[in-house]
C-alpha cells in the first residue's frame, strides 16, 4: 500500500469511529 491509500484508509476509520461515538453520545443523552 502506498502512503495515499494508507491516509485515505485512516480517514475512513476515523470517520467511522467518530460517527459511532456521536451516535452513542446521542443515545446516552436521550
Curated annotation (Swiss-Prot):
Q: Output the superkingdom of the source species.
A: Bacteria
Q: Where is this site: Cleavage?
A: 28-29
Q: What is the effect of changing residue 30 to F?
A: Loss of MftA decarboxylation by MftC
InterPro entries according to UniProt: MftA
Pfam families named among the record's database cross-references? MftA
Q: How is it modified after translation?
A: The post-translational modifications that lead to mycofactocin involve oxidative decarboxylation of the C-terminal tyrosine residue catalyzed by MftC, introduction of a tyramine-valine cross-link, removal of the modified C-terminal dipeptide by MftE. The released dipeptide then undergoes oxidative deamination by MftD, glycosylation by MftF and methylation by an unknown enzyme.
Instruction: Spell out the disulfide connections.
Output: none
Instruction: Name the family.
Output: Belongs to the mycofactocin precursor peptide family.
* More about this protein: Mycofactocin is classified as a ribosomally synthesized and post-translationally modified peptide (RiPP).
Q: How does it assemble?
A: Interacts with MftB.
What is the stated purpose of this protein? Precursor peptide that leads to mycofactocin (MFT) after extensive post-translational modifications by enzymes encoded by adjacent genes. Mycofactocin acts as a redox cofactor of nicotinamide-dependent oxidoreductases encoded in the same locus.
What is the protein name stated in its UniProt record?
Mycofactocin precursor peptide
Origin species, per record, is: Mycobacterium ulcerans (strain Agy99)
Amino acid at each position: 500500500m502506498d502512503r495515499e491509500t494508507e491516509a485515505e484508509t485512516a480517514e475512513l476509520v476515523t470517520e467511522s469511529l467518530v460517527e459511532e461515538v456521536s451516535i452513542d453520545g446521542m443515545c446516552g443523552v436521550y
